[in-house]
UniProtKB/Swiss-Prot annotation:
One Gene Ontology molecular-function label: histone H4K20 methyltransferase activity
Function: Histone methyltransferase that monomethylates 'Lys-5', 'Lys-8' and 'Lys-12' of histone H4 (H4K5me1, H4K8me1 and H4K12me1, respectively), thereby controlling gene expression and remodeling chromatin structures.
Organism expressing this protein natively: Mycosarcoma maydis
Name under which the protein is recorded: Histone-lysine N-methyltransferase SET5
Pfam families for the chain: SET
């Protein structure tokens, strides 16, 4: 993580004001300070900055109006009437952080909203939708194959970009084979996209240093690690000569920058996904104490393999292997610290956590889909869009489950909403690092148990323990565990992405 200078903070705030992220273009309003700070911390991976210091810098540089003395607390002081002091604000690392990437285009009738640092971002309807309406379709920003498809993709049976069967290719002559490995692509479009966003850096025939990483992913069927690798490859591809058309002067050379974005655009998009350390997720697993040592060991192995494969500054890169494709011409002084930080172990833990809490159930990171918050009474469902009479694993559609009105938040269910209250709360807490869920359904069921969640009074884990205790069966009438109960631990481990 980076400790920003005052100049860096000022420059970043001015850039946000100019981009229209705030409601005014010249100053930051008091009610926008915390949201802006959370956004900048995540986007630039800054160390936690006290709100007091942030406000002081904004006021000093006339980026925020100074509060009047009779407003209670001034922006330059933590002193309040009665001699009390405000508690220093620090970001809770157990809560996933996200922000809205201003380059995202929202479909008609939908807007993106940043609610607060805890809930993060979401989607809200700006017009009415009827039950069954299609609200949007979306292709994966980072396509990642389902674990069961790894072997078929590696052997060339499935397209390495869209993961549809090669045999279903619309035109046999359009099938493209990688000349350096067994990966195949079902169309010219899939081939061009893959080469521009990941395959050039992850192909073991082109980048021999990537072989241990790919072997680890395939051996462990480690989907979240594969997602991290493809995410970083997409970012680093923006720093290659091929990406900028310098390696191929043909007239039909694809303008990759215009199609897929430059370094800053891709970095901002990836950073905007909700992010939390994988260690935070793992620590909520009931078997964490037992598996901690072995898991941390394989994480270090994965981190080492990732750095050897993709880190432009890795000291362990084999100089005798084919030259790395990232060009020093594009590694300027601004990008260098960002890239170095991306490959440190702590950031790697965050990248794995980001992949696990954002990937759609079949894999892949989706820009709009990642905005959707959870409710046990969802008004949307996500379906996969058929292509060539086959359900495409990397294209989704959002369908209204009921009538939706203007200003309604668009929500999906991350889990099976028909399971018990205690089980839903448990899975959401462990898999998605939030809770307790207080949607209408949960609030009603909690109320029936005499429970009302108050964040000012209740610690999350203690409250969830109360829910479990209240819903526990009478010990005098306990039945033998069902197959569903006995596999809960297995399901939890699977849902943790490893």
């Amino acid at each position: 993580m980076v400790a920003p200078s005052e100049t860096q903070i000022v420059q970043a705030v001015k850039a946000k004001l100019e981009s229209g992220l705030t409601s005014t273009s010249d100053v930051v309003r008091e009610d926008e300070v915390r949201r802006l700070l959370a956004t900048l911390e995540l986007e630039h991976d800054w160390q936690d900055i006290a709100v007091k210091k942030f406000i002081s810098i904004l006021c000093k540089h006339s980026l925020m109006p100074v509060s009047k003395p009779n407003d209670g607390c001034t922006s330059r002081s933590t002193s309040c009437p009665g001699g009390k002091k405000k508690k220093k604000s620090k970001t809770d690392t157990s809560i996933p952080k996200s922000f809205i990437d201003p380059t995202i285009s929202f479909p008609a009738g939908i807007r993106g909203v940043y609610f607060d640092p805890v809930k993060g971002k979401g989607l809200v309807a700006t017009r009415s939708f009827s039950k069954g309406d299609l609200l949007f379709t979306e292709d994966a920003y980072i396509p990642t194959p389902p674990p069961e498809a790894f072997d078929q993709m590696a052997s060339g049976q499935l397209c390495a970009q869209c993961f549809l069967p090669i045999s279903s290719a619309p035109v046999a002559l359009a099938i493209k084979n990688c000349s350096k490995c067994k990966h195949r692509f079902c169309t010219t479009a899939c081939y061009k996209t893959a080469m521009a966003t990941h395959h050039t850096l992850l192909c073991t025939g082109i980048n021999a240093s990537a072989k241990p990483l790919i072997e680890l992913i395939e051996r462990q069927k480690w989907q979240s690690l594969h997602c991290v690798a493809r995410s970083l490859a997409r970012l680093l591809m923006t720093l290659t000569r091929q990406y900028h058309g310098q390696a191929n002067k043909k007239a039909d050379t694809q303008d990759s920058v215009a199609t897929y974005g430059d370094f800053e655009t891709v970095y901002a998009r990836l950073s905007s996904f909700a992010t939390v350390s994988e260690l935070e997720r793992r620590s909520r697993n009931p078997g964490w104490t037992t598996e901690k040592a072995s898991f941390e060991s394989i994480l270090v192995e994965a981190h080492t393999a990732l750095c050897n494969a993709l880190d432009p500054y890795s000291s362990t890169r084999n100089a005798n292997l084919e030259p790395f494709h990232v060009s020093a011409d594009y590694l300027d002084s601004t990008r260098k610290p960002l890239i170095k930080d991306l490959f440190c172990l702590a950031t790697f833990m965050k990248l794995v956590g980001r992949a696990n809490i954002n990937m759609e159930k079949f894999g892949g990171l989706y820009s709009l889909h990642s905005f959707l918050n959870h409710s046990c009474s969802p008004n949307l469902e996500i379906r996969h869009v058929p292509e060539r009479a086959i359900l495409s694993s990397m294209k989704v559609a959002a369908i209204a489950l009921c009538d939706i009105h203007p200003d309604d938040e668009l929500v999906i269910s991350y889990i099976d909403p028909n399971t018990s209250l205690a089980r839903r709360q448990l899975l959401l807490y462990r898999d998605y690092c939030f809770g307790p869920c207080t949607c209408d359904k949960c609030t009603t069921q909690l109320g029936a148990l005499g429970l009302v969640y108050d964040p000012a009074k209740h610690a999350v884990k203690a409250f969830l323990d109360s829910v479990a205790h209240k819903t526990r069966p009478d010990p005098d009438h306990t039945l033998p565990p069902t197959s569903q109960d006995s596999t809960l631990e297995d399901q939890l481990r699977a849902s943790l992405g490893f």
